Amino acid sequence: MFSSLYPLARASLFKMDAEDAHHLTLRMLGAAGRTGLACALSPRVPDAPRTVMGLSFRNPVGLAAGLDKDGAAIDGFAALGFGFIEVGTVTPRAQPGNPRPRMFRLPEADAIINRMGFNNSGVDQFVKNVQAARYRGVLGLNIGKNADTPIERAADDYLYCLERVYPFASYVTINISSPNTKNLRQLQGAGELDALLAALKDKQRRLADLHGKLVPLALKIAPDLDDEQVKEIAATLLRHDIEGVIATNTTLSREAVKGLPHADEAGGLSGRPVFDASNAVIRKLRAELGDAVPIIGVGGIFSGEDARAKLAAGAALVQLYTGFIYRGPALVAECVKAIARGEAR
């Protein structure tokens, strides 16, 4: 029923400010998850199980980080049939993010520009929300740095967040690719990334001993990388035995949206315009990584065929964000069914 009602709901939501609509949707999904209404109204999504990063996924279609930054609506999203949920990005301390307005729809391009800036309630509240959720499927927790933490001390923030979220995560995503936190993408540089991942892997080993379980680490990277940068990142992932990589975050490019309303707004562009760039990075990563490090593909998925294209490029799993906002819950089932059909051939 959610799927059939969504076009009507979207018409109303798209008349609102984009961020206000986002918050309203989160509140509604949070309430639906707490009451069980989401399960009763959601479409049936078939199982298409697989094992990736040592984790068992009900199906390969997940929710990307950013839609639920504080983990406040985990149960509501889970009821929509996602095979896994990723929430965050969370930082050590609460922060308001960048000034509003900071989210803009570009419906002519099936796109969104955002410059949110890791607005969140801080890792302590985040952990409380995660603990309160009833969902027991694969849950990714996405961590970042506070805006006022000098880039030279960024590792301190990531290490602190990793320690706090580790006991509650199926996997932890290291987000170094948001364009909306000053200098954050510098951490994708060879030397900076090598030092950060070395520190995080050392912390992971100690936390695994403490908690009696190894929680995989995944690195989230940008689409705005040249071939040499992708090669360097891949080599660093292999050198440090990082368990996964998420490709990609939003793009700074505006080539595909030139002349459209809001196209000149600062921030990261997501949606259909990032699809090809994301797939190109996935293909380059797969060529460098082989089967050693699984890739989670995200960026511009608006149909089941789009999801299959991500897998064909080299992804093991996919995530939805902007396509989910434009298409609604029906997109989840469509992607799972398309992937299952393709694998059955």
Curated annotation (Swiss-Prot):
Record-annotated active site: S178 (nucleophile)
One GO CC term, this protein: cytoplasm
Binding site for substrate: K69, N114, R115, M116, G117, F118, N175, N180, N249, T250
Cofactor dependence: FMN
Location in or out of the cell: Cell membrane
Similarity field: Belongs to the dihydroorotate dehydrogenase family. Type 2 subfamily.
Protein name: Dihydroorotate dehydrogenase (quinone)
Species this protein is from: Burkholderia mallei (strain ATCC 23344)
